[in-house]
Amino acid sequence: MEHYTEFLPISRADMEARGWDQLDFVVVGGDAYVDHPSFGTAIISRLLEAEGYKVGVLAQPRYTDCEDFKRFGKPKYGFFIGGGNVDSMVSHYSVAKIPRAEDEYSPGGKGGARPDRSATVYTRLAKQAYPDLPVILGGLEASLRRFAHYDYWLDTVLPSIAEDSGADIISFGMGEHQTVEIARRLAAGEPVESITDVDGTCYLTDFDHLPERYVECAGFRKVASDKVAYAKACRIQMDNQDVVSGNIIVQKQSEKYLVQNIPAKPLVRWELDKVYALPYTRRYHPIYEAMGGVPAIREVQFSIIQNRGCFGGCNFCAIQLHQGRRVTSRSADSIVAEAERMTHEPDFKGYIHDIGGPTANFRFPSCREQMLRGMCNGGKHCLAPTTCSHMIVDHSDYLKILRRVRELPGVKKVFIRSGIRFDYLMADPDDTFFKELVEYHVSGQLKVAPEHCAPNTLAYMGKPPIETFNKFKDKFYELSRKAGKKQYLVPYLMSSHPGSTLKDAVYLAEYLYKNHMRPEQVQDFYPTPGTVSTCMFYTGLDPYTLKPVFVEKTAEGKALQRTLLQYYEPRNAEKVIKALKMTHREDLIPLLVPAEGRIAVQRSARRAEAADVTIHGDGTYTVRPRGKGGKPQSRSAAPAGRNPAGRQPSPGARFAPHSAPAHKPKSNQQKENTSWKTSKKKK
């Protein structure tokens, strides 16, 4: 296996091979060790290495005790810890709170290699191993839990992860500036308790040591008992996440106060170029080879990240609270150089899978005003419900980069697989980029995210009206025909988002039918910590208006909305018919429900009318045909995948940091998939 460089030490033997007696820092991660800039552990460890520190990587350590945290011996300065690229709870559980058996960020794609709430567990174990050493906790999982937050898996409000974990400092956002400054100050001998002024960090303190100027939001106990207070706190937090206009935020936790400093400045272009030019091997560590490798590398190994941040402002998205709404991007030379290096890799077949980021076609900040006054607050969006008149729309720079990469020797195709923001694309009066996108950069299918079609639901999502998507869709197929290509759109669609009623779901099903769209896999809204949509889900309030928002929380209601997205499946006929009857849209039954499904529902109804069903106390039931002799049949009433008592394992069962998981997934559960095929119905 050829590499650009060596992997960083993962064991004491690796340290000794380099002639090191002691590390300066240990970087702990919840993912398997993949030395690629798409992985947070790789970036932070390589960045520290570039600053001259001796760094070791502790990937997916054992979490039954703290012994694995002593693998390298005691580091000189401390630990940098992250939970992984994906929130560990999302990684472990479906939106229905069913345990997953798979984890693409673990060896062999198997689950169980990290604990629930891994960021908290790892921090506690590091503190247990070396109580006197500083622990800096960062990454997505910590960023989204820096304030008191609603926890969907326990269905309760939890305090800041700073309190639960015991971390000395929470580094929120992408973390490069914070990491370098904190490391420098620790190495200079400064006590971690005095490092309280770094932008992009949070810490706990008492009332007497609060900063002079700050805005305060309702404390943990208040937001845990008062949903209006929770919604107001959410708005304060969202309105102060801009590096120009944001203020220091204070929120009382159980005893101490959480202080969030203003966000760190985004990396400027040369800094981004430097980060992505670090000597990554771009591969998973060889120790995973015998285990089947790390599946997550497949999609990103030959992909290039060209930007960070997103001003799209979707309410359900964590990016605005983590990466921020200000877009920064790498230089064309940096991107082309990375593509050229790829062509020399032994596994490269000529295909670059993606040149993108959170939103592929964003290259610059949305407008000049935000550079002076910061991003707009109060729930205002650059693109929804309409495109802001101040927004700068320009694809020319991105187009030049794509052209240069296409011309590299050894490159056959350059695809764009990360999300294209179609409303931004449609706002560009110059359609040159759109034409070349269709002709050169679509691998048969293009992923886009209309999410829904009902106006009310789209408004709560922070998405543009469906008419914008319709115009984009028509133009995409028109340009594809002109280019002589048979290409399809793959729309991201979501059910049960706050504000989405059953009538809205029926409206979406009707839209899909009329537009010949048949989603093969569907996604239910997943309430993850820190987002505006999760605030609406928990409180039933819009945090910007405090007006009530309908939220579907019942299992039956969610199932009806979800199955309406797959109205065409005969197995969904019963639920689809029920939803249509409940919304008085029986006129749609012949259109949405296939004949096979309607017949099956009728037969099932006749059988139910002709039988006596007795449910017994032990969870079994007996079916006895009416008017017939026959031996009754006894069956288990417990749904598949549950224990005889019908109980689900609790997602909170693995919260204890010093014990093994209380259960292991036994079935091959599927993750929520955000990929659907769309077909044009033949006329």
Which functions belong to the PLM regions below?
Residues 31, 291-318, 343, 351:
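N-terminal pre-triad scaffold of radical SAM enzymes
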Residues 14, 40, 59-253, 260-261:
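Glycine-rich beta-alpha loop elements in corrinoid/cobalamin-binding modules
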Residues 87-96, 144-146, 176-181, 205-209, ...:
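Flexible glycine/acidic-rich beta-alpha junction loops that bind and position SAM and/or redox cofactors
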Residues 2-22, 32, 228-303:
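N-terminal [4Fe-4S]-dependent radical SAM core
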Residues 27, 43, 62-63, 341-490, ...:
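Conserved SAM/AdoMet-binding glycine-rich loop
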Residues 604, 609, 613-683:
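Intrinsically disordered, Lys/Arg-rich low-complexity segments
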Residues 64, 193-241, 255, 264-267, ...:
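Terminal amphipathic helices with adjacent charged low-complexity linkers/tails
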Residues 168, 275, 310, 335, ...:
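Conserved, mostly hydrophobic/aromatic
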